[in-house]
Each structure stands twice: as C-alpha cells, then as structure tokens.
Amino acid sequence: MKKTLVLLIFLISFYSTAQKIPGKTYETDNYAITFPDTWKTTDDSGIINIFPTNEIGAITISEYHDLNLPKGETKKFILALYKSADEEKKVKNSNGKKGYTEYNYEYFDEKEKAFWITKVFQKEKNLYLITINCEQKYWNGNYMKLFNEAFESFKIKK
C-alpha cells in the first residue's frame, strides 16, 4: 500500500511539473498555427515556412483562393506535388471542420532521404496546403513530436 502511494505521489508530481515547450503562434486573417518559440519563420511571397534553427526540416503553409480545382482532382494534385507513382487511394480524405474536406498523404523521398507529410484542406475554391518535410535521420523522438504538434495545431478561422 505504501509503495503504491509513493508511486502515485511521484507520478502526480512528475506530470504536474513536466514542462511544455514554450510556443508562439503565427496568425493570419485565415488561419493560425502554434510552434516552438525557438523556431524561425519566413514569408516567401505568401508561402510560410516554419523551421527549427538547425534547418533539418520545415512546415510549409500555402493558401489559395479562387482556385478552380475540382475535388475529384485533388488527390492527383497532391500526388503530382511529389511526382509520386502511388495510387490515389494512398491519399486519405475525410470531412473536416467548417465544411472543409481534409486530405492526408505521407511520402518518403528515397533520393533526398526525407519524410513528407501533407494535409490539404479544400472547400469550394479555397485550399490550404500544409506540409512537413524532415530529414530521415531526425524523424524520430523529439523532432517528430514537435513537428506533429505544430502540424496538428493548424486551425482555419473561416
């Protein structure tokens, strides 16, 4: 009983003192994303890149409005980004929030030895393209966790 109580107290104190990495938020009129505050951002003509200072990968966000891309072509569009020979069924889609269709695709670039994870949110003529790319040797443990947490924090406002 005492051992259980000591273990319980230890676990409670451990989880209550565990620190979350401080974050900052990149925000536009249309979306927001939160990422570690030590990471950098660039805005290259409306294409946003968010990356750790050692530049071993990045999250890239592009938004398109008045884009005439039929939903039936979106999976082909995603595969074409990587010149992938994968079948369209590897691109998963589901009904997302706020009326957007969400597409997900994972790709490993053998030549560059990099992982690519893509999300596309599409509604009518609006499309948000969010990607993670990360060198294979860093796609583990902490970096994978940080990239995924930032990726999952992406929220469309409208």
Q: Where do the model's predicted regions map?
A:
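N-terminal "mature-domain start" segment
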Residues: 20-44
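Sec-dependent N-terminal signal peptides
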Residues: 3-14, 18
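Conserved polar/disulfide-associated segments of primarily extracytoplasmic proteins
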Residues: 41-129, 136
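Intrinsically disordered, low-complexity regions enriched in Ser/Pro/Gly/Gln/His and often acidic
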Residues: 8, 30-34, 109, 132
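Soluble non-cytosolic domains of exported or imported proteins
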Residues: 30, 68-72, 141-145
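Surface-exposed amphipathic alpha-helical segments
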Residues: 19, 39, 130-158
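A general secondary-structure boundary signal
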Residues: 6, 98-102, 151
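Stable alpha-helical elements in mature extracytoplasmic
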Residues: 35, 73-78, 143-150
